[in-house]
Swiss-Prot record:
Record entry for activity regulation: Interconverts between an inactive cytosolic form and an active membrane-bound form. Activation involves disruption of an inhibitory interaction between helices at the base of the active site and the autoinhibitory (AI) region. Activated by N-methylethanolamine. Activated by oleic acid-containing phosphatidylcholine vesicles.
Identification of the protein by name: Choline-phosphate cytidylyltransferase A
Note: The cytidylyltransferase may interact with membranes through its amphipathic helix.
List of residues binding phosphocholine: K122, W151
Amphipathic: region residues: 228-287, 298-315
Pathway listed: Phospholipid metabolism; phosphatidylcholine biosynthesis; phosphatidylcholine from phosphocholine: step 1/2
Record PTM Phosphoserine, positions in chain: 233, 315, 319, 321-323, 329, 331, 333, 343, 345-347, 350, 352, 362
Name of the coding gene: Pcyt1a
Region spans: Disordered: 1-31, 313-367
Amino acid sequence: MDAQSSAKVNSRKRRKEVPGPNGATEEDGIPSKVQRCAVGLRQPAPFSDEIEVDFSKPYVRVTMEEACRGTPCERPVRVYADGIFDLFHSGHARALMQAKNLFPNTYLIVGVCSDELTHNFKGFTVMNENERYDAVQHCRYVDEVVRNAPWTLTPEFLAEHRIDFVAHDDIPYSSAGSDDVYKHIKEAGMFAPTQRTEGISTSDIITRIVRDYDVYARRNLQRGYTAKELNVSFINEKKYHLQERVDKVKKKVKDVEEKSKEFVQKVEEKSIDLIQKWEEKSREFIGSFLEMFGPEGALKHMLKEGKGRMLQAISPKQSPSSSPTHERSPSPSFRWPFSGKTSPSSSPASLSRCKAVTCDISEDEED
């Protein structure tokens, strides 16, 4: 049994494991099943300045080997991840998920930079700092949020928050006059790399909005926003309204075209059905006509039968046995009407002559 089972396992097709959207592996593109769990976080992650910290215990950083083994058991590994988190999207959530799952027992601290630092070093944001704090607070992987996080991490900040490792993608982040703001963290052995999610970023989202600015401006005008709120001039407002009407007319024309195409298609289908039915009926009619009036049709047989009956009625055939002529044929003792008396016993010569004459008369009557 063991040999058979091992042979079956070896003969199976090797399935490719691909990371799924939920971080689990997928087999041949099919998401792996997970057990349904109704337990979830009911409160947002607290801010760091709202948590009481026991500074009486000394801060001893955990090494990478100990963190991977899940030790020490008395406390989790404290991992720090920072960012701007403007227009919080799935790329941010995936990065925080990776940071949370770096070690078996992880406590994730997320630092969010303020508007002042962000505007000075990176540029203007769509969301203000309070909105960005709130967005990160409600991410399920976050255990603690640090407001007004520093742009460059200092030893004092790391010691204050008792940070063991810093999680970020390993692409050099040049800013604030430095080629890589995480260079000293990497040199200290505290850097834990994560993978960036391709195809999604705050800059990409803003690019989409700017690229289709007219579409979104018309959309918001249609939903009740004023031109002043959208910072749209009077001329552009009228232009957008006109474009909206033109689009409605185009949509109606397109609907009419589609309906007309459907109608024409239905008519064509009906006409094809009618033609097929007409062909079938015409074949049946021609077949029945030929059966009745063709060379070997029923009508010809009827005429032949009628003609035969008429001829039989006009001149019926007489059978030789029932012919009246045969019944009236004279016997050998035929008497001539002009002979008055019966002659006495005739001679043999006269009798033979009478027989010959009688036979000739009988043959003439039959003819």
